[in-house]
Every structure is written in C-alpha cells, then in structure tokens.
Amino acid sequence: MEINYFISAKATATVQNINVSLSAEYQKDQAPEVISVVANGYLPNGENQKYMNAALKYNTKSSDFDSINGANVDLGIIQEIVPLITEFYRKITETFTNY
C-alpha cells in the first residue's frame, strides 16, 4: 500500500464585507491544480441586503473556474476574488524556490 502525503494551504480575506476562504492541497514540489474558494456574507446593496453564499473551484492550469455554485452569487465580487486566488497561488509556488 502506498501512502500519499499532501500539504494543505489556507488563507482568509474580506472583499466588500464578504468573507473569503481559500484552500488548496498539493504534494511537495508540485503546484496545486485546484484552489477551492468559499465566499459568504451580505452583499453591499443598500436596504435590500441579500446573503451571498458561493463555493468555487478554480483550475490553476486553465486559469478559469471549473465550477461556481451558490445563492445570490455576485459576479463583481467574484472578479475581485480572482486577484486573491492569483496571490494565494503565487505564494504557494514561491515556497518551491525558497528551499
């Protein structure tokens, strides 16, 4: 039996009062192929506040989302999350060159 060990990376941020959690699992010296994102909170649109709840899977090879699921998903906020994903991925891959 072969046991595979994975490294788990996690980060949190806030985008327009929406809580964003990023996570990835990967093997040593290999970049993660998928970054998972969970975003939830009240959308900043005045009196009729709606609660956004989104689960996203970002494919690092195609630089695109494999899936976007949830309720009241605001694409403007998703666009603001993309730079967070890019920074998260960059910081993970930087660790390979720092050893």
Q: Locations of the language-model features?
A:
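Viral virion structural and adsorption modules
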Residues: 1-21, 27-34, 38-99
